[in-house]
């Protein structure tokens, strides 16, 4: 008795341990979602699955039970009354298993479609073929098709159950009789028609009906057809395929009646005829469609397909939100004068002379401070700095987890990044280096931007956990040879209670979490620290932009992300990159210190986000609740902009005939590799190759020109604004035919503006401009000399900006010594307008040489506290002292003497501050 009780207790304990191990992931998810404030989002899925599972299980169980009940007489006849009761138990158990598995599979795969179906929001647009609202295709049709597939699967399961029962019981009965030498029952005399003829007749009829209905549903998929010259249903789809589908559906209905009657009457010929008729129709459809397409449509394709091409143009433009682009004609002239530049000097003052690649390389050499920091990316933003609207590069300084070798350093000691580097986009120092306004550790801030808490616990680095508030403290930042520590005082993370220590030891499969003496009950474990994975964990149904960016807000750092709603179910819209409808409907803000995540709805007209609002109550906030200063940092997402640019290469036209003849197809402008040293390393002008020809020969050197964030002013506008620009060429040619700009400041956010250029003229595109640079004898000679001396020549971004009715071209050249710790420095500026092109040391000299324009002296006198586009404007003695300190700091950095480096940098900061106040 005691042994029995002991065994029961041991088994119970073992079961509890197993359940605990299995449920660790669920328990942690519940705690984490509660911490971030979205526990209701986590349970939305679970509750939906549970709500669906119960009725679906009942449906499955009842259908199978009723079906088995109809077979009871046949089963009793096959096994006898004695064994029938025991067989019933197996049937009940089998029904339970099948129903649980079927309901579970259906609920876990269809819960989302059902929620979309029940919370559908109309688009207010209908497709041109069936006159159905777009919401039918996006929210409803996928569920209906899935349910029909499930119903067909259930019919097939019932047929399989019938066959398995018939074979299993009949075969078992035959073996049993032979083994015991009892009278042998010849199972062949009890055929399957007698066993389940009526049941199979019903199933076959229902299956035929379902197949017929599925063909009616299949008709709706024709709006995604790729058969014709445009995406969506074409002439053949509408006039041939759709009719065939209807005929097949009618044939299936007739067949269901024929099959039912024929099975009962044991007449197989009608069954064969009906099934053969359907098969012939199914086979005949593509044959007739191909014949029609080749011999009817092809000879008259333009006339027959014209309305369907129009449908595709309209749908694609609406779906990608490019149907309301403001298009302006522009015929660029070459008459930029000094007067015109003076009228547009705000454009000149904001010309982008820094490029992300060289700048990030410089940051990594000078601003990492220690090897356990890293800069993952440099983003472009704008701030009001000391009263002036200024575009800047911003790069957060995060912890480099790969530099950590021990568990304690990786998870307890080095827990957060510190501060950021910020420099002006439109200026460099006299050495061609970034003009910093925020730098170093602790942060040296020469702006009026308030940054009190520069710590980064959540960022773009890896997603591994850290444990804060430990006994040893966390490394904060270095000061010479000493290390300052910090104890986390934020709200992020889960408390390390004894229960949680056990839980996370199991979850992370690391006993150190349980055994470490540094971890106390006040310690917190911070999970999902990668901001992209963090927001994906909360809202996986959104698509996120690949480039989050950091913003200084209210004395701390926050991340801003663009999130998209998308689908591939928009009728007649041609898919690009897996979607054929997309909206940037959500802005996500993640606190870099606490990890708080807020989702703000920015497009209230998007039906998909309105559907999500109904499904996930409490997840999204209205835009009115976002702090106003954060709205000033909205960026038009580059991923979306480039996707729209790709779509516009084909769908910038409204005329279906132009799309059909492909007479006006575009390409996004090409750029070449920005490293020019390889091309010119021989230092021989005679051996230099045209970049255009070289790009044609080596496709690896070509790449689509990325959209650039620029601070500029559009023609007819009064103020400069940050914009995203992209350039287009005529397909197969390199002459530029259009410029696309996305506006993002204030009420203009989201507006797209396109300037079209006359196609009969040669307007220099980025690659043609780069080719001109290489072909100019003065420029190529200077570049060849640098390359011949062993320096690496790096080309910056090509900038093309409109100035009233003209185009100004800008390219910068960086030099980088061929040594391990060398840094790229901007050494030359190339400016061009029309056929004129010059290369000079800075913007001022280039403007003076090209246009005889010199207004920077006035700017220098009136803005002594600021750095000009390329030079520090202070007395020579101060500049010399600053240069000497900077060079000494760099030398100390190269030698790994970080204490000395810090001293020189601090002294340099004092000198610069003194210069700025003189």
Curated annotation (Swiss-Prot):
The keyword Transmembrane helix applies. It is a multi-pass membrane protein. Keywords: Cell membrane, Membrane, Transmembrane, Transmembrane helix. GO terms for cellular component: extracellular region; plasma membrane. Pfam families: UPF0182. The keyword Transmembrane helix applies. Its main location: membrane. It is found in: Cell membrane. The chain crosses the membrane at residues 8-28, 46-66, 91-111, 151-171, 200-220, 243-263, 271-291. It comes from the Bacteria. Belongs to the UPF0182 family. HAMAP family: UPF0182. This is UPF0182 protein CPR_0011. It comes from Clostridium perfringens (strain SM101 / Type A).
